[in-house]
């Protein structure tokens, strides 16, 4: 059984724009799968359809054999609990402490009123501190999140997903706004948790070299369709030219070396 399955998935926006065209993919447990393509190719739409931040028009998406497309109410909340999300712009409560932001990964496990009052059990705080230690910012736990650098804020996001105890992490252009050194640190963190914890990573990346260096599998989208799906080691410049519909520009190759 695949961890994530896209079955005949299509997305058409109200204005008639086709975001996804008949996508069929199987993502296996423990993969580090990178989605690449031009802006507007459907990368974010595909990624965000997994946890239903974007609903699809037709087809079905399964998480560990269960349809998240048809899930509602408590069943949907429980499925989303197993899917962590990392955003390009961090999606943190800037004025809250680092620890409080990481603890928000536990929200799906408790009644809303307890979360509003900040009544997290001791066990959750231990999980949060462990997550911060794993991404090397435990010493920042009591600082306001907006006092940290962009790379450190993205590590808070990763720690939040770890605290959520997700088996799947979706990352939507997580290093697009970071400098090369910080990019390497964040990507190394993601690879480490993928390899050490067996967490499945499905990530959108803009830079070709990053995709080849960190991905075990590359999925190329062009105009909402999958035009390449294979090992990162076999993704040549010609393959990327096919995905992008043109020769790759130098600023699209930027890696972390």
UniProtKB/Swiss-Prot annotation:
Keywords: ATP-binding, Cell membrane, Membrane, Nucleotide-binding, Phosphonate transport, Translocase, Transport. The keyword ATP-binding applies. Residues 4-248 form the ABC transporter domain. Its EC number is 7.3.2.2. It comes from the Bacteria. It is found in: Cell membrane. InterPro entries: AAA+_ATPase (IPR003593), ABC_transporter-like_ATP-bd (IPR003439), ABC_transporter-like_CS (IPR017871), ABC_transpr_PhnC (IPR012693), MetN_ABC_transporter-like (IPR050086), P-loop_NTPase (IPR027417). GO terms for cellular component: plasma membrane. Disulfide bonds: none annotated. It catalyses: phosphonate(out) + ATP + H2O = phosphonate(in) + ADP + phosphate + H(+). ATP binds at residues 37-44. One of its GO terms (molecular function) is ABC-type phosphonate transporter activity. Belongs to the ABC transporter superfamily. Phosphonates importer (TC 3.A.1.9.1) family. Part of the ABC transporter complex PhnCDE involved in phosphonates import. Responsible for energy coupling to the transport system. The complex is composed of two ATP-binding proteins (PhnC), two transmembrane proteins (PhnE) and a solute-binding protein (PhnD). This is Phosphonates import ATP-binding protein PhnC. It comes from Staphylococcus aureus (strain NCTC 8325 / PS 47).
